[in-house]
Amino acid sequence: MTRQIIAGIILSAIACCAQDGPQSTLACEVANNTSGSPRYRGSKANAPPGNVSKLPIRSLLYPGSQTRIYTRYMPWFGDSHHRDIGYRSDDRQQVARQVADMISRGISGVIVDWYGPNSGSKHESTVLLMHEAERQNFEFGISEDAGSLAECQKRGCNVTEQLTSDLRYAAEHFESSPAYVRFDGRPAVFFFGLEKYSIDWRRERRSLPLKPLFFFRNSGAFNNPDGDGGYAWIAPETASPADPMAMQYLDRFYSKAQSSNKIAMGSAYKGFDDSDASWGKGRIIDQQCGQTWLATLSQAGRFYSSRRQLPALIIPTWNDYEEGTEIETGIDNCVNLQASVTDERLTWTLSGPKNTVDHYVVLAQHGRQWTQAAELPSETRSIPLSQLSDQPETSALCVEAVGRPSMLNHFSGPVQYSAGRSLKP
């Protein structure tokens, strides 16, 4: 990593946070470089917005992966029925920041949890995301949520006709966009929870002009004659003491996908905890300080390789704060870092899971400016000062533990140093 990359990361942190408060300067401190609002203070399942590793998420998949990586977006924040997380989902500038943040992590596109064209601010957020995807060369798609048909069913109207109306709107207003998610040239439409309704899927297909691909959830999608593809999700209801990460759910999905010619979209997640949701049922998949994130991403490698590629993968979710699945604010890897200088040598200690740190960066201070003085492998714990590329006569040094992709970065705090004399922070 070059000095320019380090500077770019911290400058992006400043850009992300500029709308909400004081700007952080290039320094040995945690600066929010995410699209999460600094007003959000975190919860049991979600870290406060922090300094997040922007290493590409793809690097956690199998070697040679060409998998398209998507994430699910919830468009409802700012609605009084949901938690206040410090931003509105129908804020144009906020949506722009979110797309930029997703791109910076190596995400290919976003799939919106869509409630139809008459869903008010949720629909407005969806439209904003489409326009921002077009502007930033990003992908965008919609997933029709079961909630879009709830009122129709309550009134006793025909849910198939209501779905047809929604999907015709999507065809005209979304699927014609150059940013829309496509496989083999055909737009992809996803469905979430619609299995609870009696829908004439053949009639749906006949009524849609652009002949979209239908993607259904879970491994049963591969046996569904009405579908063209299946996507994995997160299954906290299957978690158990013997399977705390719900990995058997993923194994079942990938195993079924292997014997099907339908398009497979795997999944990876940090964990699950719906204690902040008004509809919560106490379901939990423990994050295990980032281990669940690493394990679910690597699981695809048991079934796919550079010779047999997984077409796509979805991360549930970008911003479901209420079910504790969001990665927007960063994944807490429970790391703590301390450093000192003794006998002309910079030394540091790390507490927390070592496999959640990708590498270390040593920063050196000149006045108010910090520059990169060294980049070191994750197993390193010290370096002679003579080996630093920046050796001012009087300086402060700092060690940054750069997390694995989308995990929090951690800083030691400045270690004051003068030639021939050193102090602990």
Region annotations inferred by a language model:
Residues 23-336, 340-359, 364-367, 372-425:
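Glycan-processing catalytic domains of CAZymes
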Residues 10-18:
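Hydrophobic h-region of N-terminal signal peptides that target proteins for export
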Residues 1-6:
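Bacterial N-terminal signal peptides that target proteins for export
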